[in-house]
């Protein structure tokens, strides 16, 4: 009947989140960057070939605002939009950390397979069609190295 302008935004995994690690299956996506940069070992529970759909905290804020400010007529009939992100492997994530912070930092990432977490992560989509999100003014991060640099420059505790 048109009484409610409901909108659904499907978000990529947001990383690198500041703060402490938690029990979420996706926690390692931030932890393998955040903890080594803080001088702490980080355990990665999935294989280096695991691909993930990611977005930075700053970019997701812009996308949420764009989704809110867009006219209802810009949304598809489902009122559901995939938010743009980047698709990278865990290996690419660690390589980006290595380029930004060096070998000693990247070597703090240790791989210890956790079948339960791996099983969950492998069910997540690795890529999305985000054309509608882009049309609404949502942006994509320049790459994972840019996400790491953004964390170091703006969110990493000093």
Protein language model features and the residues they cover:
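NAD(P)-dependent short-chain dehydrogenase/reductase
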Residues: 1-50, 57
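Mid/C-terminal beta-alpha module of Rossmann-like enzyme folds, strongest
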Residues: 36, 45, 61-118
């Amino acid at each position: 009947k048109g009484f409610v302008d409901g909108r659904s935004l499907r978000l990529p995994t947001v990383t690198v989140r500041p703060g402490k690690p938690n029990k979420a299956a996706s926690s390692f996506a931030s932890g393998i960057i955040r903890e080594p940069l803080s001088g702490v070992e980080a355990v990665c529970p999935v294989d280096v070939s695991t691909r993930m759909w990611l977005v930075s905290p700053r970019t997701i804020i812009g996308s949420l605002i764009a989704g809110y400010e867009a006219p209802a007529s810009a949304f598809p009939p489902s009122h559901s939009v995939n938010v743009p992100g980047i698709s990278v492997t865990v290996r690419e994530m660690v390589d980006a950390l290595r380029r930004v912070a060096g070998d000693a930092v990247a070597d703090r990432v240790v791989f210890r397979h956790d079948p339960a977490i791996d099983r969950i992560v492998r069910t997540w989509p690795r890529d999305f069609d985000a054309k509608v999100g882009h049309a609404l003014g949502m942006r994509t991060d320049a790459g994972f190295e840019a996400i790491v640099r953004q964390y170091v420059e703006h969110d990493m505790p000093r």
